[in-house]
Amino acid sequence: MTRLRLLLLLGLLLRVAVCSVNTITLCKIGEFKHENLCCLQCSAGTYLRNPCQENHNKSECAPCDSEHFIDHKNRESECFPCSVCRDDQEEVAKCSRTADRVCQCKQGTYCDSENCLERCHTCSSCPDGRVVRKCNATMDTVCDKFDSEPGQSGSQCFCFSKPLGIVVIIAAFIIIIGAVIILILKIICYCKRGENIQLSSTML
């Protein structure tokens, strides 16, 4: 009898375990659980108005209102408000139902912090126009420095403007050509001098 009771108890436990597994709702990727149902998520640009009524079925979704967006599949009850550009920024990408508005600092200013929560800064100017990298919306101007200031490292670069650089190159070329010509003339004179000495010795 004891053995029979153990078998009955094991059978009962197994049945309970199987029933528990059957009651667990496993949702697929792109679905969300609502009560005991798996509902499809809303697509980008829409939000959830009402969950589905049948398992693995579509939910009732509604499009985002003007100046609102959602850029991914979701089960949100409302869309997110689009960003608003400040007066020191300009719009580079418009707000849509599937993408937020993109703003950046206006020309001549920059902001190098994440999300640019502070005001845009005026771009630095370089003395004598020695610019290594021009200023843009996210980075300040980088200048070349002849002498490093205390605590700073400067690149020891002696840079020339384009017209001056061309003049220097031409002058160097002329000097080299002149030196070669002078060397050739000296060699010719030396050879002639040697011939004259040899001729005088023969005549004597």
UniProtKB/Swiss-Prot annotation:
| PROSITE patterns (UniProt xref) | TNFR_NGFR_1, TNFR_NGFR_2
Q: What are the TNFR-Cys repeat spans here?
A: 27-61, 63-103, 104-143
The stretches that face the Extracellular side, renumbered to this chain, are: 20-164
Cleaved signal peptide residues: 1-19
Transmembrane annotation, as ranges? 165-185
What CDD domains does the database record attribute to this sequence? TNFRSF26
What Pfam families does the record tag this protein with? Answer: TNFR_c6
Subcellular localization, per the record? Answer: Membrane
Looking up SMART domains in the UniProt record yields: TNFR
One GO CC term on file:
membrane
Q: What UniProt keywords are attached to this protein's entry?
A: Disulfide bond, Glycoprotein, Membrane, Receptor, Repeat, Signal, Transmembrane, Transmembrane helix
Q: Which residues are glycosylated?
A: 57, 136
Q: In which tissues is it expressed?
A: Expressed in thymus and spleen. Detectable levels in lung.
Q: How does it sit in the membrane?
A: Single-pass type I membrane protein
Q: Which InterPro entries match?
A: TNFR/NGFR_Cys_rich_reg, TNFRSF10, TNFRSF26_N
- Give the intrachain disulfide bonds: 27-38, 39-52, 42-61, 64-79, 82-95, 85-103, 105-120, 123-135, 126-143
Cytoplasmic side stretches: 186-204
Question: Looking at the record's lineage, which domain of life comes first?
Answer: Eukaryota
Which PANTHER family would you find in this protein's record?
TUMOR NECROSIS FACTOR RECEPTOR SUPERFAMILY MEMBER 10B, TUMOR NECROSIS FACTOR RECEPTOR SUPERFAMILY MEMBER 22
Q: What is this protein called?
A: Tumor necrosis factor receptor superfamily member 26
Q: What is the lineage of its organism?
A: Eukaryota, Metazoa, Chordata, Craniata, Vertebrata
Q: Which gene codes for it? A: Tnfrsf26
